Amino acid sequence: MCFSPILEINMQSESNITVRDDIDDINTNMYQPLSYPLSFQVSLTGFLMLEIVLGLGSNLTVLVLYCMKSNLINSVSNIITMNLHVLDVIICVGCIPLTIVILLLSLESNTALICCFHEACVSFASVSTAINVFAITLDRYDISVKPANRILTMGRAVMLMISIWIFSFFSFLIPFIEVNFFSLQSGNTWENKTLLCVSTNEYYTELGMYYHLLVQIPIFFFTVVVMLITYTKILQALNIRIGTRFSTGQKKKARKKKTISLTTQHEATDMSQSSGGRNVVFGVRTSVSVIIALRRAVKRHRERRERQKRVFRMSLLIISTFLLCWTPISVLNTTILCLGPSDLLVKLRLCFLVMAYGTTIFHPLLYAFTRQKFQKVLKSKMKKRVVSIVEADPLPNNAVIHNSWIDPKRNKKITFEDSEIREKCLVPQVVTD
């Protein structure tokens, strides 16, 4: 605390006059101590700015590509995924900049309103992210386990998203309700209640001040349990055993296919040897057809194994990313509810909040850029962009660019205009005839 010196001069005379010379105006512009160390502020602000740039750029790219292609919006899964990307854009625009403001504020400033808005944004980001991830998990379970009879139709998906935004908005209002922001009484009653902001160790330990934490914690743990159960069911539906690369059933099926193919080959060879010269051609054809069928079966088996590996890998990445980003702050919120807030816990909460905001970068990578349809749309847009740049800036001296995107060899049509080349091509046909 900075106290202004007061110079008191007591003059005793006949009238006992007391003169007080206040020199408050001298120190009004003095340096006020910051609430956090400079290194702490610089490091966290740098990470938050990086999350704003990367998260905003990637999520806007995904939303623009989804809106440009109508066939992507027609899918229920893509609409639910777009809802998550819209949320990430809101977090990058509104929540992360407010966290930067909280980091750079001083102790002596009146931060009650800003702290209240910050807690509201944190509550909104936590609850809405968990609910959106929960909705995407249900959609993937619906696709993998019940592809023929889907529960999430287009109408139900729209109702689900409306309910998600209503609940998220309610979670945003909870910190304001805690401090009686909307009460009709005197407006100064709520200003002294700081919500998890580093102040002068003046924290309210009443349970009514932390209802927003009581909402965030159970929603997070419920989402984690549902994710673990749902992705386990998805892996079981795809015949993937956790901890093993391939199941025994697949190995038995492969062995049966091999034995059947070998017996068919032996039978074909025996039949060809026992038959006369007329059946030689038939035996060769059957052996060739068996070989082709074997190759197709092996190819299908490899594609299925690759798909299983990809699904298993993506499931692990989705679950581990959500746990890595949101588990620390959820555990710390539980600790604050049990022990009460302190300066150390509030500083740790800001660090863990930076980790939680990292989902704005990981969500486009996990839910959009890994989809094959989205990759095709992105490649087509990049091709058109490259072609437009080349057409706008032609190279001098009639230079030719050999690019697989612009001038693929497989699309070239070979034309023979010379009569000599035509005659050379027609010579073998005349000889065989």
Swiss-Prot record:
Main location: membrane
Sequence intervals crossing the membrane: 46-66, 86-106, 116-136, 157-177, 209-229, 316-336, 350-370
Residues carrying a glycan: 16, 192
Tissue specificity comment: High expression in adult and fetal heart tissue. Expressed in the brain, with enrichment in the accumbens, amygdala, cerebellum, cortex, and hippocampus regions.
GO BP, sorted A to Z: cell projection organization; cellular response to hormone stimulus; G protein-coupled receptor signaling pathway
UniProt record similarity statement: Belongs to the G-protein coupled receptor 1 family.
Described purpose of this protein according to its UniProt entry: Orphan G-protein coupled receptor. Seems to act through a G(i)/G(o) mediated pathway. May be involved in ciliogenesis.
Protein name: G-protein coupled receptor 22
Organism whose genome encodes this protein: Homo sapiens (Human)
Gene name in the database record: GPR22
